[in-house]
């Protein structure tokens, strides 16, 4: 195995963990591409991405083009003369000129077992859909959306209480060693490229705040999965009327109970064991929630000052 000169492209913390693995390896990271700094926090100060922060700690040149479609940006990247470009949650579309610039092209770490869950939110959608397992795929990028040839897959089960946050953490542990295996075998072509079967593909649509609103006409099982899939963002919520004012309450944890005899959206019970709400099928038992302006709390703490919010028989 010879040392590879690598361009790394990524933006969030998930990507930074892969960059760290490359920095700890025998390979040479010659440049980092990441999204432009964005306003964050109350002061709306410009904040560097986790990938940029890590790169600067290691004195690696950082490039932050708004787009890679322009010829000057493409020429700048090509001039780096990299062996390979590694792309992890970068957030920009790579034109064909960029994909073909490095000697071995561009490799992508994708958070699903392709061709299942192509697109922006594979980790969240695997929980949302009730998948039993997921994993990461290292693929050779092409001009399609997550359609490139697959080089390596690593699988992991999805636990019954898995949230997107916990699954992100799990995949962030699994993926970097898998990436290094592929990089170490690039020269010898140790990993044979496997075409994706488009007939088995589906699309992992971005999450939206609107989708996070709990719809009592869904089943309790689906709502419970939504609560886990939408944690840490955008967090599921319900709305209810209190003294003529609509209140929004975020929901962090719930479980499913089988019995039900009332119309969907009816409060069946509210005590220290949970707030039970009838759904289209089954009962959603909410155990951790967050009123506006407060921290997440147990159902008992919530009901201590707000018992009337979820009166038995109330229709949400």
UniProtKB/Swiss-Prot annotation:
**Under which EC number(s) is this enzyme classified?**
2.1.2.9
What terms describe the molecular function in GO for this protein?
Answer: methionyl-tRNA formyltransferase activity
List the coiled-coil residues: none
Q: Which Gene3D superfamilies match?
A: Formyl transferase, C-terminal domain, Formyl transferase, N-terminal domain
Catalysed reaction equations from the record:
L-methionyl-tRNA(fMet) + (6R)-10-formyltetrahydrofolate = N-formyl-L-methionyl-tRNA(fMet) + (6S)-5,6,7,8-tetrahydrofolate + H(+)
User: PROSITE patterns annotated for this entry?
Assistant: GART
Q: Which domain of life is it from?
A: Bacteria
Q: Which UniProt keywords apply?
A: Protein biosynthesis, Transferase
**Pfam families, per this entry?**
Formyl_trans_C, Formyl_trans_N
Entries under InterPro entries matching the protein: Fmt, Formyl_trans_C, Formyl_trans_C_sf, Formyl_transf_N, Formyl_transf_N_sf, Formyl_transferase-like_C_sf, GART_AS, Met-tRNA-FMT_C
Q: Which family does it belong to?
A: Belongs to the Fmt family.
Note the PANTHER family from the entry.
METHIONYL-TRNA FORMYLTRANSFERASE, METHIONYL-TRNA FORMYLTRANSFERASE, MITOCHONDRIAL
- What protein does this entry describe? Methionyl-tRNA formyltransferase
């Amino acid at each position: 195995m010879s040392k590879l000169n690598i361009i790394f492209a990524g933006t969030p913390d998930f990507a930074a963990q892969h960059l760290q693995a490359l920095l700890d390896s025998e390979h040479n990271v010659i440049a980092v591409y990441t999204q432009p700094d964005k306003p964050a926090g109350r002061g709306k100060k410009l904040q560097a991405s986790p990938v940029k922060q890590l790169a600067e700690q290691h004195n690696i040149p950082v490039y932050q083009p708004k787009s890679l479609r322009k010829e000057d940006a493409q020429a700048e990247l090509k001039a780096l003369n990299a062996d390979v470009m590694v792309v992890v949650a970068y957030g920009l579309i790579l034109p064909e000129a960029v994909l073909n610039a490095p000697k071995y092209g561009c490799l992508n770490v994708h958070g699903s077992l392709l061709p299942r869950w192509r697109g922006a939110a594979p980790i969240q959608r695997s929980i949302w859909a009730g998948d039993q397992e997921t994993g990461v795929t290292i693929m050779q990028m092409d001009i399609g959306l997550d359609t490139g040839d697959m080089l390596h897959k690593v699988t992991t089960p999805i636990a019954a209480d898995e949230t997107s946050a916990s699954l992100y953490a799990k995949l962030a542990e699994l993926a970097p060693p898998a990436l290094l295996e592929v990089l170490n075998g690039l020269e010898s072509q140790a990993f044979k490229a496997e075409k994706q079967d488009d007939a088995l593909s589906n699309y992992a649509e971005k999450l939206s705040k609107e989708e996070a609103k709990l719809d009592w006409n869904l089943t309790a099982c689906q709502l419970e999965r939504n609560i886990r899939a939408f944690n840490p963002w955008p967090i599921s919520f319900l709305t209810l009327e209190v003294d003529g004012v609509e209140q929004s309450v975020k929901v962090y944890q719930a479980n499913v109970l089988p019995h039900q005899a009332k119309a969907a959206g009816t409060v069946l019970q509210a005590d220290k064991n949970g707030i039970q709400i009838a759904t289209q099928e089954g009962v959603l038992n909410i155990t951790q929630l967050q009123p506006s302006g407060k921290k997440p709390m147990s159902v008992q703490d919530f009901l201590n000052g707000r018992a009337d919010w979820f009166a038995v028989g109330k229709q949400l």
